Amino acid sequence: MRTRVSGIAAFVLVSALAGCAGGPPAPEPDVMEVILPVPAEQVKTALSDVLTQGGYTVDQDDAGDITTGMRQEIRSPWNGLLRWRFGVGKTRVEARVVPQDDSTTRLRLQVFHRGKDGIFGSWEDAETPLPQSAANEIRLLKNALRLL
């Protein structure tokens, strides 16, 4: 009887420890897909302007892909320190612009956000803050295109 009780206790202990071994769940990807009644070139130009105004450096290729570097949090030489060690969040954007026809464009925009708890924490995928979210970037793009 004693071995049975100790076996059950060991099983419960191992189950409890295994349940605590995993990290926090990964956040869902911050992705939005929209169809805009605007030509593709106009969407690319407006999206580049919106992202540049938001503090991103924008790169475009001929295939319709728009990517950014990490968002500039402050306009000073200390911005690199924020992205490297002292900040608590950093964001970048990837977008795919596909022309449907002459006057309609499909846009897929994804925002990647990494965060940490403090100076000595490590960067992990995190939920995107609302000002940098994909939904807000789409809203700003629609404002720039005068669709709202």
Regions found by a protein language model. Give the residues of each.
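C-terminal motif of bacterial Sec signal peptides marking the signal peptidase cleavage site
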Residues: 16-19
